[in-house]
């Protein structure tokens, strides 16, 4: 969709093909320019006269910091990983390359890209055109100078606006069909299969996919607290934003400040390839997002025609499945390319997905997936409207009107001291009555499976909704308060216990369910602060940085009691564990002792013991139940003893000693030398949630967790913000800004975020670069 940059030759890169929507945009292009002012940690403050110029500055600055990252993601969303890296390797998200390619070839067809582009208003098109031109300008300069080593390869090329659309559509389906990549790619009718045709590699891929789906909310979780004037220390709004997102890849946040004088002035963080702010603040308000528990897709069980397993019965009539041929270029062992075709089958609801043992395609049934966000072409308009909002009402009205938020909640505050929560996103319009009539109650509500043989079981259509088949915003949870609202990836029910949000469709929010440990921590902490006075900025920062392990308060006393009286013949073997637990400070700080590691192992083992709680969950007391380990029950005591013994063995096997500290174990090495990282597993009630994978020498490498942090309040002049980008601004290990904020985060050093002209120009690291086409 964008013309080639004049004056630059890219050696070794193929000539671009004509893009589907190119004719739509040729007349809209004009020269662009921007001023990029960098302050501490290399954060860019980009100023331009219009959207095209602003996009130009964003794309240019982003490529300076993250060229290899975006180039890699462009390969992914074009379905070209098998072409460049081979079919059997995996993406950063551990998706099989071939499966990933099939999904994106199907998702990002020329028609889908053209339709999305056509739906964008001129402002969004100009932002995207500018971004492409700016990125390509930086690429040309870096190509001349020598590309960074990780991407000095043939797969790096100039991008187009189609590529930005592909990236955006990839983000949209993260909460839907994107979670079923392997199940999508592996769907074949039974007549064409060898016995089940599930080889060991496919089994492993599906197992990884299942684990990844379960981790979705953890990897893309979040905490947010919005404090209103009745509770804030300064009588104004106060916001804590603590999204938990991946530290690498296509969901890695980028910090920036965007200004079009007289029209836009917003600072915060954005996901790769997006020319706007997703989480941030402006002169009037501040906001954040948390991944919601709402359902953004449904599965439809197809009753197959007994004569043909590629036909299904709908209202008694036999209907042929759609067949779409997708071809993936695959790199062979000798380096040549081979086109591998694959047929994608679909019903009127969406593509057929197959998960052996879970969602089988046999001669009786198959399962089709309908993703609500496939028709969401409003997402970029939504965030740009939020970025420009000059009041909380305008902000809220934009979310109601556009309905472009894909799979997150929104929490916001304004300078007047209002605190807002909205569980408004793109959710299938299926109420409790229809769900009871059209689904098997034995399946539960973790996956919504509707009867695909009856049209009446499809999604309802509301004239009030921005898109056919989704819930209108008026029927989704929202709450405006002057004390507080908070959220940590539970349902909307207990956002504020003084005003429970109840009786919504099970696809939107379920009440009466146990809260996660982080929500319990937040509500308990806010209640304590409310009793002792007002909430300050420092209080909100401490919620993240003091690294309290909330779950320890519920079970550690019983663990110590068990250590003191129930060890018997295992006393000597368990003595180091019990000593470490007693000495542990109950936190996930860098200096926290080995007792924290033992505690994690024990709790993980005990998750499988259904009778472990002394006090079971009580919907009337959701903040403080369940609690207490029922060590007086023989089955619990037996399981606990086994868990403790296993923990001792695991710690010994990892080579950890009694003197090991948490900061010796949990690290980030993405920029080179390991940096110790505080925080820990979200399931333990650690607000500063971190997800890790096994590293070398018993270490744990952070892959996801606390990412962009901001605490924002207001005075008579506007916003006062402090923040951090935990993994730093640049993903290039050679950059000066690949580890500086990570080191600051490790030391718990927040930074004042310069927002006004005076603050920006007074910054000691202030530098200016003017870029023009």
Swiss-Prot record:
Gene: pvdQ
Spans through the membrane: none
GO process terms (BP): antibiotic biosynthetic process; quorum sensing
Cellular component per GO, a single term: periplasmic space
Name the record gives this protein: Acyl-homoserine lactone acylase PvdQ
GO MF annotations, alphabetized: hydrolase activity, acting on carbon-nitrogen (but not peptide) bonds, in linear amides
Described purpose of this protein according to its UniProt entry: Catalyzes the deacylation of acyl-homoserine lactone (AHL or acyl-HSL), releasing homoserine lactone (HSL) and the corresponding fatty acid. Possesses a specificity for the degradation of long-chain acyl-HSLs (side chains of 11 to 14 carbons in length).
Additional remark text: AHL-mediated signaling mediates quorum sensing in many species of Proteobacteria, regulating hundreds of genes, including many that code for extracellular virulence factors.
Subunit (UniProt): Heterodimer of an alpha subunit and a beta subunit processed from the same precursor.
KW ATP-binding (keyword) present: no
Propeptide: 200-221
One Pfam family per UniProt: Penicil_amidase
InterPro entries per UniProt: Ntn_hydrolases_N (IPR029055), Penicillin_amidase_A-knob (IPR043147), Penicillin_amidase_dom1 (IPR023343), Penicillin_amidase_N_B-knob (IPR043146), S45 (IPR002692)
EC number: 3.5.1.97
Annotated signal sequence range: 1-23
Family note: Belongs to the peptidase S45 family.
Keywords, ordered alphabetically: Hydrolase, Periplasm, Quorum sensing, Signal, Zymogen
Active site annotation, chain numbering: 222 (nucleophile)
Record's catalysed reaction(s): an N-acyl-L-homoserine lactone + H2O = L-homoserine lactone + a carboxylate
Subcellular location(s) per record: Periplasm
Domain of life: Bacteria
């Amino acid at each position: 969709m964008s013309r080639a940059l004049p004056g630059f030759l890219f050696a070794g890169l193929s000539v671009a093909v004509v893009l589907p929507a190119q004719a739509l945009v040729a007349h809209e292009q004009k020269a662009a320019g921007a001023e990029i002012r960098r302050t501490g940690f290399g954060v860019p403050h980009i100023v331009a006269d219009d959207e095209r110029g602003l996009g130009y500055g964003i794309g240019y600055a982003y490529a300076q910091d993250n060229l290899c990252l975006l180039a890699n993601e462009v390969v992914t969303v074009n379905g070209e990983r098998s072409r460049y890296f081979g079919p059997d390797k995996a993406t950063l998200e551990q998706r099989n390359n071939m499966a990933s390619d099939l999904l994106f070839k199907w998702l990002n067809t020329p028609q889908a890209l053209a339709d999305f582009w056509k739906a964008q208003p001129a402002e969004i098109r100009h932002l995207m055109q500018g971004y492409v031109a700016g990125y390509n300008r930086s690429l040309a300069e870096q190509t001349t100078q020598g590309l960074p080593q990780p991407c000095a390869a043939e797969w790096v090329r100039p991008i187009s606006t189609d590529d930005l659309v592909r990236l955006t559509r990839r983000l949209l389906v993260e909460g839907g069909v994107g979670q079923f990549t392997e199940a999508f790619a592996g769907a074949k009718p039974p007549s064409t299969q060898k016995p089940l045709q599930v080889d060991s590699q496919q089994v492993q891929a599906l197992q990884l996919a299942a684990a990844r789906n379960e981790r979705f909310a953890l990897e893309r979780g979040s905490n947010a607290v919005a404090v209103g004037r009745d509770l804030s220390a300064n009588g104004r709004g106060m916001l804590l934003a603590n999204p938990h997102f991946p530290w690498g890849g296509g969901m890695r946040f980028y910090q920036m400040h965007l200004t079009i004088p007289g029209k836009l002035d917003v600072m915060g963080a954005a996901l790769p390839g997006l020319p706007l702010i997703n989480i941030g603040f402006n002169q009037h308000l501040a906001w954040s997002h948390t991944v919601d528990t709402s359902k953004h897709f449904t599965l439809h069980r197809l009753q197959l025609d007994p004569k043909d397993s590629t036909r299904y019965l709908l209202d008694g009539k036999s209907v042929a499945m759609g067949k779409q041929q997708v071809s993936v270029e695959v790199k062979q062992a000798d380096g040549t390319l081979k086109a591998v075709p694959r047929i994608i089958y679909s019903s009127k609801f969406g593509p057929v997905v197959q998960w052996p043992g879970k969602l089988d395609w046999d001669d009786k049934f198959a399962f089709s997936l309908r993703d609500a966000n496939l028709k969401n072409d409003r997402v970029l308009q939504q965030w740009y409207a939020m970025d420009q909002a000059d009041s909380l009402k305008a902000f809220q009205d934009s979310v109601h009107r556009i309905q472009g938020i894909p799979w997150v909640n929104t929490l916001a505050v304004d300078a007047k001291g209002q605190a807002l929560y909205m569980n408004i996103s793109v959710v299938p319009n299926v109420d409790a009555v229809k769900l009871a009539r059209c689904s098997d109650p034995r399946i539960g509500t973790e996956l919504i499976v509707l009867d695909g043989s009856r049209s009446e079981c499809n999604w309802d259509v509301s004239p009030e909704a921005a898109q056919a088949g989704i819930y209108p915003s008026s029927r989704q949870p929202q709450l405006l308060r002057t004390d507080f609202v908070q959220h940590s990836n539970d349902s909307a029910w207990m956002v504020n216990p003084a005003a429970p949000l109840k009786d919504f469709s099970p696809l939107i929010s379920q009440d009466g369910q146990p809260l996660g440990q982080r929500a319990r921590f937040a509500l308990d902490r806010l209640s304590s602060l409310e009793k002792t006075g007002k909430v300050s900025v420092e209080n909100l920062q401490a919620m993240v940085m003091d690294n309290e392990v909330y779950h320890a308060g519920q079970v550690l006393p019983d663990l110590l009691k068990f250590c003191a009286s129930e060890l018997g013949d295992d006393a000597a073997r368990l003595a180091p564990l019990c000593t470490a637990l007693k000495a542990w400070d109950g936190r996930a700080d860098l200096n926290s002792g080995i007792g924290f590691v033992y505690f994690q192992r024990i709790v993980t083992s005990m998750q499988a013991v259904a009778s472990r709680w002394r006090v079971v969950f009580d919907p009337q007391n959701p903040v403080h139940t369940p609690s207490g380990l029922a060590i007086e029950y023989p089955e619990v005591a037996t399981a606990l003893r086994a868990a403790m013994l296993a923990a001792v063995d695991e710690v010994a096997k990892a080579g950890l000693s009694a003197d090991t500290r948490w900061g010796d174990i949990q690290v980030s090495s993405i920029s080179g030398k390991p940096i110790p990282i505080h925080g820990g597993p979200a399931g333990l009630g650690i607000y500063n949630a971190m997800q890790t994978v096994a590293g070398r020498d018993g270490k744990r490498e952070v892959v996801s967790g606390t990412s962009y942090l901001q605490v924002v309040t207001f005075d008579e002049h506007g916003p006062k913000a402090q923040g951090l980008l935990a993994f730093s601004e640049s993903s290039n290990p050679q950059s000066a800004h690949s580890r500086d904020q990570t080191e600051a985060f490790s030391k718990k050093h927040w930074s004042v975020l310069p927002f006004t002209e005076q603050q920006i120009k007074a910054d000691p690291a202030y530098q200016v670069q003017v870029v023009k086409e």
